[in-house]
UniProtKB/Swiss-Prot annotation:
S-adenosyl-L-methionine binds at residues 74, 79, 125-126, 144. HAMAP family: 16SrRNA_methyltr_G. The lineage of its organism: Bacteria, Bacillati, Chloroflexota, Chloroflexia, Chloroflexales. It comes from Roseiflexus castenholzii (strain DSM 13941 / HLO8). Its main location: cytoplasm. GO terms for cellular component: cytosol. One of its GO terms (molecular function) is rRNA (guanine-N7-)-methyltransferase activity. It comes from the Bacteria. Its EC number is 2.1.1.-. This is Ribosomal RNA small subunit methyltransferase G. Belongs to the methyltransferase superfamily. RNA methyltransferase RsmG family. It is found in: Cytoplasm.
Length: 234
């Protein structure tokens, strides 16, 4: 975990010994579970640090004031939500994962790492986005899922409070995708405030799309399960 500590420190992020130990245990549990549940194609220990942990922690440089409530959509193996929880133990984090086996891993790793104030919701994002307990309740919404930005914002912006931020880690060739999503972002109450480079040694250039919520999301969104992916707002 030396590289994790070194790069996080260079970004101005502080990790103590307990947090480093939590990341080490996270890596070990991820690799063990991945032998029976398809959680990630990345199994090399160093790549877990660079492509999962550091890529997740980079979000903390772009969320403005430290949030109190964060929701991670399509959390999978917990990225970026759980590394951000480890970084800021005071965060209240909700992880949304519709696949039962992945949600079971999330419940397991939350217990193993003794993380408090973490809720795992086994449901589709479209359903969660219409639930008054979650709708427009979060300071930060994250989504690292492999989907078009126009689809991701329909999952995420309904959950974001006005003034909050939606953070979408993406690959390098993102300009056209941002342009295609401009109508969806505006209709859902968002405004792009940055497309930031994410530079991690040994990893191809990635980007982080930063969207601020400037207006309420209309009641018609998100649409029914499956529709945002099949027919994005374009």
């Amino acid at each position: 975990m030396d590289e994790l500590l070194r790069i996080a420190t260079s970004w101005g992020l502080r990790l103590d010994q307990r947090q480093i130990e939590q990341f080490a245990r996270y890596s070990a549990e991820l690799r063990a579970w991945n032998m029976r549940v398809n959680l990630t194609s990345i199994t090399d220990e160093r790549e877990i640090v660079t492509r999962h942990f550091l890529d997740s922690l980079r979000c903390a440089l772009s969320w403005g004031d430290t949030p109190s409530r964060l929701i991670d959509i399509g959390s999978g193996a917990g990225f970026p939500g759980l590394p951000l929880k480890i970084l800021h133990p005071e965060l209240h984090v909700t992880l949304v994962e519709s696949v039962g086996k992945k949600a079971a891993f999330l419940q397991h790793i939350v217990a193993v790492l003794d993380l408090r104030d973490v809720t795992v919701v086994t449901a589709r994002a479209e359903v969660v986005g219409r639930d008054p307990q979650h709708r427009e309740q979060y300071d930060v919404v994250t989504a690292r899922a492999v989907a078009e930005l126009a689809t991701l914002v329909e999952y995420g912006l309904p959950l974001c409070r006005i003034g909050g931020r939606f953070l979408a880690p993406k690959g390098s060739a993102i300009d056209d995708e941002v342009v295609r999503a401009r109508i969806a972002i505006a209709r859902l109450g968002g405004q792009v405030i940055g497309v930031e480079p994410v530079e991690i040694p040994g990893v191809e250039l990635r980007t982080l799309v930063v969207i601020v919520k400037v207006a309420p999301t209309p009641a018609a969104y998100p649409r029914a399960v499956g529709i945002p992916a099949k027919r994005p707002i374009l």
